[in-house]
């Protein structure tokens, strides 16, 4: 039995004829099994995702047709692009700049997404690549736009897409590099700032869970010479950002994709995180609950988990259930920093 598909995919189902016989490239916010239907319609299908969780869910079915990375290159080989609108406009611009050099002249440009998610800015997004797109459909509070690649495209330069800023956490100064859509892409967020001010000195091995642009792990690596740092995230854009942040600061660390603990082996002396949280998205909360509940399995004897969270989130009961001791080591009206020991 197939899983339910999103409202955007239900709208696309009404427009299947647009994709028949195409050499189709799909990217953006993918969240269901709909690409399996596209595989039956298109003459060839390539699905590019920066989301490791989604990649794992589809890889067994789509096989070589699905790719997980921060970048896709090569010669022009597609005659249609379907971009499912990301939450961040800058990420949509990044994907279009990356994918259009892979399209043949005259290729179809399809943009689909929820009306509340920025899809109605399709005109401006597609302006560098062709004439004003046509709105093909509007259903279930979603819209589908259709344009054509009629303007010359410039080669994609990955380095041009990194934002750069200097941040200071206590006495530790850091240069941060981040791709569009990555958490802490433009500045050090207040939660991470509080976490880094509260965390004690560290030795041994550290896991930075949900590393984003690599700020937390990099600050702790710089502050604690000899600390072995591993950073994990589900976002390929975050992982590449973390690699760049480590490198530009002359720091060492391992960076890898993991869906919670899917690809983690061994035990750590410290796990530190500003866990992903987005109001109203139960999937993020469930992933964080799993992360907290299973953390003791990945901590060495006397190991500790340090997290920062919005003050209204009820993480303390979860921590107290799975750890011998949990203390709030810093707090204000917005955030709490918890230190839990096995």
UniProtKB/Swiss-Prot annotation:
UniProt entry tagged with the keyword rRNA processing: yes
UniProt xrefs under Gene3D superfamilies: Vaccinia Virus protein VP39 (3.40.50.150)
Highest taxon above the source species: Bacteria
Any one Pfam family match given in the protein's UniProt record, by short name: MTS
The enzyme's E.C. designation: 2.1.1.172
Alphabetized GO MF terms: 16S rRNA (guanine(1207)-N(2))-methyltransferase activity; nucleic acid binding
One term under GO cellular component: cytoplasm
Major location category of this protein: cytoplasm
Subunit structure and binding partners: Monomer.
Family listed: Belongs to the methyltransferase superfamily. RsmC family.
Identification of the protein by name: Ribosomal RNA small subunit methyltransferase C
Gene name of the encoded protein: rsmC
């Amino acid at each position: 039995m197939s899983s339910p598909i999103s409202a955007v995919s239900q709208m696309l189902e009404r427009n299947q004829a647009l994709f028949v016989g195409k050499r189709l490239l799909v990217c953006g916010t993918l969240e269901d099994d709909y690409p399996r239907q596209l595989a039956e319609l298109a003459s060839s299908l390539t699905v590019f995702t920066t989301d490791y969780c989604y990649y794992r869910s589809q890889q067994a079915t789509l096989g070589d047709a699905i790719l997980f990375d921060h970048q896709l290159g090569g010669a022009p080989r597609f005659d249609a692009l379907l971009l499912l609108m990301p939450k961040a406009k800058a990420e949509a611009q990044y994907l279009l700049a990356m994918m259009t050099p892979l399209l043949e002249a005259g290729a179809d440009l399809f943009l689909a997404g929820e009306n509340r998610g920025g899809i109605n800015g399709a005109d401006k997004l597609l302006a560098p690549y062709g004439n004003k797109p046509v709105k093909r459909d509007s259903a279930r509070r979603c819209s589908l736009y259709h344009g054509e690649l009629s303007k010359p495209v410039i080669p994609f330069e990955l380095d041009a897409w990194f934002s750069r800023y200097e941040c200071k956490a206590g006495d530790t100064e850091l240069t941060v590099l981040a791709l569009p859509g990555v958490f802490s892409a433009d500045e050090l967020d207040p939660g991470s700032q509080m976490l880094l001010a509260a965390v004690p000195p560290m030795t041994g091995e550290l896991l930075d869970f949900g590393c984003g642009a690599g700020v937390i792990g990099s600050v702790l690596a710089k502050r604690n010479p000899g600390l072995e740092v591993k950073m994990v995230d589900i976002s390929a854009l975050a992982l590449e950002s973390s690699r760049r942040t480590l490198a530009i600061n002359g720091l060492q660390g391992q960076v890898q994709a993991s869906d919670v603990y899917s690809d983690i082996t061994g035990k750590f002396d410290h796990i530190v995180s500003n866990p992903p949280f987005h109001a109203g998205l139960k999937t993020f909360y469930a992933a964080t609950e799993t992360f907290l509940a299973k953390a003791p399995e990945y901590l060495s004897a006397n190991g500790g988990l340090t997290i920062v969270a919005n003050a209204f989130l009820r993480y303390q009961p979860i921590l107290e259930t799975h750890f011998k001791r949990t203390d709030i080591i810093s707090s204000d009206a917005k955030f709490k920093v918890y230190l839990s020991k096995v």
